[in-house]
Amino acid sequence: ITTIKVNELLIVSPTQNQNPVLDVKGKELTLSLKDTLLPNTTYTVKFNGCVLDVNENNPILDYSYLFSTGLYLDSGKLSGHIKDITTNLPCNTCNVQLYTSNSDSVIIKHKPDYLTKTNETGYFQFNNLPTRNFKLVALKDVNKNLMLDNNELVSLATEIYTDKIIPDTINIFPFYQSSFTTMV
């Protein structure tokens, strides 16, 4: 096996401050997480095509690895669709970010607690979440820093409880500096 674009494609949730490292030796893949793990927490590692088979370099899609630092795996789920209101098309390159904080400025100051990406139809899904309330934000993260910056597309923050299918599409819209200063 081999890997490509690990820092771009690999997602660990809850998110880590330091990028994880994938090490390949023959047919063995080792994942090293550099941050301290939280107690009693389920972690999801989504490979998103960053691992390729050795024969034809085909990406291994839709592969996730789960583990828990507690006695059980969390089972909460959350799913929905994201649409770019500027084009009226599904957002196929959006982050969907969950925060445990209720602060309005959390999306400009902190990385999300949980992260997933939309597929080509704008669909997203979180699995193995703790059962609780979250603040959900969709973000077209141009500079890939997992925080809202000027001229990126963002949704309004939505308070959501896990184990939900969001019935309405979440729309994202342009974010400009003038609205940024009112949030800080």
Question: PLM features: what roles do these ranges have?
Answer:
Residues 1-121, 125-128, 133-137, 151, ...:
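Acidic, low-complexity Ser/Thr/Gly/Pro-rich repeat segments typical of extracellular/periplasmic
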